[in-house]
Amino acid sequence: GMGADSVVGAASAACPGAAGDTTSRMIADRNIRNMILADGPAGLRLSRHFAADKDGNLIPGTEDASLGEMSLLAGKGEKKELPEGAVTYYQYCTAIPIATLLAQTWDVDVIAQAGDIVGEEMEELGVTLWLAPGMNIHRNPLCGRNFEYYSEDPLVAGMCAAADTRGVQKHAGVGTTI
């Protein structure tokens, strides 16, 4: 989602469905480029589709993580008509197994390969930072996000997160945010 119609967690103006972007204010005076942040503990969570006009500008409300799409699901509103020359794009990301399952393999090479898949998709889709891997330990079984964390053992959790990060960082210009 973009602008006023964005959904929390999908507010990127540069990569539809990404969690957000950093400010553009530092490009001119400090030559610091925007960073695009994508969520998703089991691979990148991005919009599966979006549309752009004939000049390549994103058309707000056409991606599947927008309020425009949600109002259609609720039975309100009408499908947005695309302007002449608009193109619909698709960006399907790989669904990586959840962290707990990856840790249960006891194989840091497999976890690094999963990170490599995510890093390749980040490069391809222009995402700079992956808001993962989740780094916590399973202290309470009532925690609703334990599936995002590798283990209740801090050593196992750290080794797994490091392997995932190594896999992602095989690709220049992308990283994780443990």
Predicted stretch roles:
Residues 1-178:
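Glycoside hydrolase catalytic-domain context in secreted enzymes
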